Amino acid sequence: MNIHEYQAKALLKGYGAPVAEGVAILKVEEAEAAAKQLPGPLYVVKSQIHAGGRGKGKFKELGPDAKGGVRLAKSIEEVVSHSRDMLGNTLVTAQTGDAGKQVNRLYIEDGADIARELYCSLLVDRSVGQVAFVVSTEGGMDIEAVAHDTPEKIHTIAINPEKGVSDADVAAISKALELDGVAAEDAKALFPILYKAFNEKDMALLEVNPLIVMENGHLRVLDAKMSFDGNALFRHEDVKALRDETEEDAKEIEASKWDLAYVALDGNIGCMVNGAGLAMATMDIIKLYGKEPANFCDVGGGAGKEKVAAAFKIITADPKVEGILVNIFGGIMKCDVIAEGVIAAVKEVGLQVPLVVRLEGTNVELGKKLLNESGLAITAADDLDDAAKKIVAAING
């Protein structure tokens, strides 16, 4: 689960991290009052969407020459003007895709005198089984581009979970970021704070980009991104309360209600599979034959008829879907249950696109019999390769 920048900063502020004063608004009419609560005279008006690259993004409604989703303002009047431009309009960034995201919230923040921009994130480094700091002196920009073009500028410092962030760890991180003086002193408090927040809130990612050194030498969290482990949210009602469903795909929200592992993608072949590994293999073979998957959908090992039907309806609700491939290897999952769910869903919502079903495993013959006798336009496949060829051929006509 992701949250907005202003929410992430409020959380970090609660742990004692240095963040600027700011006020979130939902309406243009709130902009003036929000700005008056801040010291000024420099303000920053920030679009709040669950995507990066906001500063370089463009608003669909404002034309190619308009400013992006993060704007400086040197007066309260400018704050109001920027707010009027941004709220309610669609921001397109490198991470949103061409559709963009509607800006429903802004964060009005006090400006800062920036001397240096750095990058700092925490994540689980699975190669060593520890939480690690990933840092770079090249902050405020696309860290993926830095990693690709100048990987030597990316430094990873893994933290021993039994010891936490030690003085040696702080020294190593500070050296990698070329911190000295006041900034190095601030680092002694900040890096343990970030680590503590990451662990206590069960985060999957904590990204500060940029972490700035101000003209006075002190550190400040200028932007913050947080992603939380959805499996741990039952422990964090305070974090769950921060969820903004308007930022999420409606199909993914519906899938979460049925405990389905569903991720919307950009292709045109809907996939329903049991098991994450089989789901990835299914998507790979679709790409091998020249098409793109429209989703990742894992119904799991113990799904019942109703859950299967729900998954099918979610897939067919995507207007991009031109064909559907159901690929089931039944172990705990029974093929007849899959067949019953698919048949029930098709009878309820109709079948407007080609449907190919490959079943193998427990009760496979019964599952195939149910499909064959359903009277529905369902194409059976003998194996995964056959299934992929048939769904691609059906779409190509």
Swiss-Prot record:
Q: Which residues bind ATP?
A: K46, G53, R54, G55, E109, A112, E117
Q: Which cofactor does it need?
A: Mg(2+)
What EC number(s) has UniProt assigned to this enzyme? 6.2.1.5
Q: Which residues bind substrate?
A: N274, G331, I332, M333
**Biological process, per Gene Ontology:** succinyl-CoA metabolic process; tricarboxylic acid cycle
Q: What is the enzyme's class at the highest EC level?
A: ligase
Annotated residues for binding of Mg(2+): N209, D223
* Chain ranges of the ATP-grasp domain: 9-254
Reaction equations catalysed? succinate + ATP + CoA = succinyl-CoA + ADP + phosphate; GTP + succinate + CoA = succinyl-CoA + GDP + phosphate
Question: Its Gene Ontology molecular function terms?
Answer: ATP binding; magnesium ion binding; succinate-CoA ligase (ADP-forming) activity; succinate-CoA ligase (GDP-forming) activity
Q: Which HAMAP family match?
A: Succ_CoA_beta
Main function: Succinyl-CoA synthetase functions in the citric acid cycle (TCA), coupling the hydrolysis of succinyl-CoA to the synthesis of either ATP or GTP and thus represents the only step of substrate-level phosphorylation in the TCA. The beta subunit provides nucleotide specificity of the enzyme and binds the substrate succinate, while the binding sites for coenzyme A and phosphate are found in the alpha subunit.
Similarity comment text for this entry: Belongs to the succinate/malate CoA ligase beta subunit family.
Quaternary organization: Heterotetramer of two alpha and two beta subunits.
Q: What is this protein called?
A: Succinate--CoA ligase [ADP-forming] subunit beta
Originating organism: Agrobacterium fabrum (strain C58 / ATCC 33970) (Agrobacterium tumefaciens (strain C58))
